[in-house]
Amino acid sequence: MSIITFNKSTSDREDFLVNKSPYQIVPLHDRFFYKEYLDTLPNPEFDNKILIHSSFTTRPFSNKQIGNKKCNDNLKGYELIANKLRTKYILFHGPANIDDYHNFTNGLSNIDLNIKDKIICIEIPAFSKAFIDYIKQNPINNSLNNSNNQQINQSSNQPLNPYYNFICEYLNTVTSFKPVNNQFQIVLDTAHLHSNGLNGIEIIKLCNEYLNYYDFIHMNGNIKDQFKPDIHTPIDSVNDKIKFSEYVVRNIAKLNKICICETKDGDYEYYQELSEEYGYSIVDKNKLYAY
């Protein structure tokens, strides 16, 4: 049984001391890494599965940031937050454009160099238009060049959507990476996968093929058409444009994963109904969660 949870505000520090449910927090600014901010964070007496989502100002795969002092300090800052809150999980967005994609392995190495003893989660983002065009113009066949992931790519004898093939190649960069100091996982975001050219059936196929490589899913709907910048909405709601979104919700429930719903235009009751209908568990209602 998968569990539905949400983004949590950090405004009420005391909640960290009592909330043992999994959830996601999103520090939005680099100033959060100042010692004064860290001193305000409580130190819970228990370990928890809090996913610390990095801000967009930290771009560890960018030519302008990879390896420089500001980027490295930010990476270390997320480690300090994780240590204080007694969680292992830190999320960074993977490359969203061609230049960053060419830095993928170097960026992973730099993250691994600057953070210690954590579970680093690389989220597949919505790709830029130029990146989508690049994938379209450079289609790849089912990749078998990564021995650690051959079974993943051999699981279907049918020709696949070229965007699906590329996404497998993209994810294999993470799953085949050999870290020294951390564990590395992926994070699949259903809204981003829709933006990148997948329908609901292909999304579930991907979830199943990489089942052993992630603990968290971002389970979001998308009000935009494919190949457009994503805007989240509750999955399988009236405005969600993911094709076969009901199939996605029905099948993710069976994966035993932590599903973070990153929306602001829904309500707890919608997700509660989703949980009851499809067999999820759901965290208790909390005024600090965004729905």
Language model features with spans:
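Active-site acidic/histidine proton-transfer and metal-coordination neighborhood
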Residues: 60-142, 151-188, 195
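A structural motif
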Residues: 20, 84-87, 117, 214, ...
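Gly/Pro-rich active-site loop or hairpin
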Residues: 61-69, 194-258, 264-265
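Alpha-helix-loop-beta-strand connector modules within alpha/beta enzyme cores
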Residues: 46-52, 111-115, 244-251
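C-terminal helical cap(s) of enzyme catalytic domains, especially alpha/beta-barrels
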Residues: 268-291
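N-terminal pre-domain/capping segments
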Residues: 1-79, 83, 181-183, 285-291
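Hydrophobic faces of well-ordered beta-strands that scaffold small-molecule active sites
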Residues: 1-8, 23-25, 50-54, 90-92, ...
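Acidic-and-aromatic substrate-binding clefts and catalytic sites of carbohydrate-active enzymes
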Residues: 9-14, 25-40, 57-71, 96-102, ...
